[in-house]
């Protein structure tokens, strides 16, 4: 390569006979020094050795030499046409950055020369703040220093991380962490083997299994407006349509209808926007730091620390709280950080999830993944969710593969880890940049790795977990069977005495008439008595909906909604100490449900009627037991009317109850539980 030949020539010039060359003018006039003779070095090998004890002057010379070599490489690359010219097997490495070697050498020498306070390499690169580019020796080649099992949580030689020019609260952990380049490896630092360059797919394969959609960059203000702009009268909006609006913002430029017709559950795609700020309001490096400082997040419960090296995935979670210095120390060692429930602490992300769950009628979960440069945190695997990968910062290369078998397509459970040898050709191989979106269906095998000098921060939104027909049938068939047992004597009759002798795995080769007769009888019983009715299906769907009410995030109450709900109510006391409420209903008061899916009306097996809701759910997954209120059977008609009328308002007098007092009583009870909203504020 150009880099190798240039380096050899320079090295030869430095190592000659150490005699000062005469100028072209025979010493009469001092010739201008050339770049190759500007640095007079006594012993280049000593200067290149990071363990050498150098004087101040020698350190300055080493910096000069390093700067010269780096400029030489940059000049050589600028003169090239951008392609790799592989002329030396010892310097070629397929898939690596062309500037990997000089950049790594520069980083190693800077780490050796810098004082301890700068050992974190917090300097910004290319004018961009917040890019953590340091790689510890534990992430370098085969001779790298091995990480010791006990991990210190103490601090030595720390300095704050800089983001947007501000020092964050957490210093990087330096105790027990080796300096970059200490291993002495000659190649670039690696936390895992770089993947081979992508191979071309068979004709038509990429089109049938994945697509890449490019969107022209829009103005940043217009992008934010699509998400943040609310209707003038938010108390009159339809929460399902609001969920569609947020999904449309997520998918742009793909239309929601197009998405469900052409991609949903069968085809992966990437949206490339060239707009790094498209999702930047949802999360950032600085937000994660603030989250760790302000809240108690525990390893394993809220935070996972993972690595994937040499084909092996490891979880390296310490015990206890995920304190910022510990998290960033592990991150600086090359570990990936996964935050399991960020919507608990980030209001903007929680709002996106809570609005989208109205559209999907299921929990919308979110995980955050922060990966250092040239790292992979997870082995190839597939998940049991429809995944929307939102790239917020940096870059990450994603490779998707077909489900291993037909039974893995639209899988019900996530897989174990796959070996690289088990994977075929990728159906999609793309690098996500900030502002890009990747969607893939459940059962799609995937893996992702960051690039040299590029970290990655992305959010994975997950929907439709355990939301398939089979989940409905699991609820439905026990209901059908239980009713059929009561109604059919044939199902309650005893089995023939010879059943065990003609049926079973050991009897599969049995072709007797008695065996065939028994098989036919069982099939007839199922066909005749286990066909579900519409009422049975309704009951089963209610059971699934109860599960959603238990899992769902609580709604975020907007200011215009707050003054119309119990959450904006304030009570006072009179002179005698009696509580005085600031609201009062009458038959002319107009009300509606707070959200389309805020409640579920369910008749239980014992005949009781309950309203399950998620108004008071916690931010953590299923933090509380299912929340419900019990009503009288005759009051269910009023709730059914409110459900069918949404998003429109009804007056209290329109409730199908026998008296005005009863109507006011029922509506007041629902409003006080946070389930209803009035058209006009009481104040």
Curated annotation (Swiss-Prot):
Cofactor: Fe(2+)
Name this protein carries in UniProt: Bifunctional lysine-specific demethylase and histidyl-hydroxylase NO66
Residues that bear Phosphothreonine: 158
Subcellular location: Nucleus
Keyword Metal-binding (UniProt): yes
Biased composition (Polar residues): 1-26, 85-94
Binding sites annotated in the UniProt record for Fe cation: 381, 383, 446
Organism: Drosophila yakuba
Assigned protein family: Belongs to the ROX family. NO66 subfamily.
Record note on cofactor: Binds 1 Fe(2+) ion per subunit.
Residue numbers of Phosphoserine PTMs: 152, 159
Region: Disordered, residue numbers: 1-162, 179-208
Positions with biased composition (Low complexity): 116-125, 179-189
């Amino acid at each position: 390569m150009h880099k190798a030949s240039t380096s050899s020539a320079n090295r030869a010039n430095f190592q000659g006979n150490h005699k000062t060359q005469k100028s072209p003018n025979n010493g009469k006039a001092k010739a201008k020094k050339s770049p190759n003779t500007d640095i007079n070095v006594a012993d280049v090998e000593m200067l290149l050795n990071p363990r050498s004890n150098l004087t101040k002057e020698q350190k300055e010379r080493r910096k000069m030499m390093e700067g010269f070599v780096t400029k030489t490489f940059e000049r050589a690359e600028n003169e090239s046409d951008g392609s790799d010219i592989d002329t030396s097997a010892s310097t070629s490495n397929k898939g690596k950055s062309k500037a990997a070697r000089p950049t790594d050498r520069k980083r190693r020498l800077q780490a050796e020369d810098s004082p301890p306070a700068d050992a974190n390499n917090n300097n910004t690169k290319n004018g961009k703040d917040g890019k953590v580019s340091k790689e510890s020796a534990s992430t370098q080649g085969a001779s790298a220093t091995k990480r010791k099992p006990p991990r210190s949580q103490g601090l030595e030689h720390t300095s704050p991380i800089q983001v947007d020019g501000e020092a964050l609260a957490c210093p990087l952990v330096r105790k027990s962490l080796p300096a970059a380049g200490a291993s002495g490896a000659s190649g670039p630092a690696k936390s895992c083997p770089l993947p081979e360059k992508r191979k071309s797919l068979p004709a038509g394969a990429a089109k049938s299994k994945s697509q890449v959609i490019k969107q022209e960059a829009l103005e940043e203000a217009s992008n934010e407006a699509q998400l943040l702009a609310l209707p003038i009268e938010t108390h009159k909006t339809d929460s399902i349509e609001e969920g569609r609006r947020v999904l449309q913002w997520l998918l742009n430029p793909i239309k929601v209808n197009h998405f469900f017709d052409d991609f949903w559950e069968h085809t992966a795609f990437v949206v490339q926007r060239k707009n790094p700020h498209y999702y930047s309001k949802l999360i950032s490096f600085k937000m994660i730091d603030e989250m760790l400082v302000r809240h108690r997040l525990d390893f394993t419960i809220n935070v996972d620390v993972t690595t994937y090296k040499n084909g092996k995935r490891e979880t390296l979670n310490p015990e206890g709280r995920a304190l910022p210095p510990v998290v960033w120390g592990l991150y600086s060692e090359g570990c990936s950080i996964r935050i399991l429930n960020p919507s608990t602490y980030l209001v903007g992300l929680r709002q996106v999830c809570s609005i989208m769950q109205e559209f999907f009628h299921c929990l919308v979960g979110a995980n955050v993944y922060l990966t250092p440069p040239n790292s992979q945190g997870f082995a190839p695997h597939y998940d049991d969710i429809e995944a929307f990968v939102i790239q917020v910062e940096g870059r990450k290369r994603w490779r998707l593969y077909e489900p291993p078998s037909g039974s893995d397509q639209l899988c019900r459970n996530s897989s174990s880890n796959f070996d690289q040898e088990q994977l075929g050709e990728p159906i999609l191989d793309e690098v996500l940049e900030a502002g890009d979106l990747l969607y893939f269906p459940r059962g799609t095998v995937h893996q992702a790795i960051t690039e040299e000098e590029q970290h990655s921060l992305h959010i994975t939104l997950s929907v439709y977990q355990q939301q398939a027909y089979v989940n409905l049938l699991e609820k439905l068939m026990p209901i059908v069977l239980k009713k059929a047992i009561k109604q059919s004597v044939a199902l309650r009759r005893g089995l023939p005495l010879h059943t065990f002798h003609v049926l079973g795995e050991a009897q599969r080769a049995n072709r007797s008439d008695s065996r065939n007769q028994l098989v036919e009888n069982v099939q007839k019983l199922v066909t005749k008595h286990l066909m579900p009715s519409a009422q049975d299906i309704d009951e089963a769907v209610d059971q699934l909906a109860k599960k959603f009410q238990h899992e769902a995030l609580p709604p975020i109450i907007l200011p215009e909604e707050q003054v119309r709900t119990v959450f904006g109510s304030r009570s006072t006391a009179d002179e005698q100490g009696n509580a005085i409420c600031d609201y009062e209903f009458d038959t002319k008061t107009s009300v509606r449900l707070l959200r389309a899916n805020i409640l579920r009306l369910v008749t239980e097996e014992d005949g009781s009627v309950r309203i399950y809701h998620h108004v008071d759910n916690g931010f953590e997954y299923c933090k509380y037991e299912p929340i419900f209120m019990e009503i009288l059977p005759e009051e269910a008609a009023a709730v059914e009317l409110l459900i069918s009328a949404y998003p429109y308002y009804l007056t209290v007098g329109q409730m199908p109850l026998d008296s005005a007092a009863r109507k006011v009583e029922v509506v007041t009870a629902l409003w006080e539980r946070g389930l209803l909203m009035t058209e006009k504020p009481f104040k």
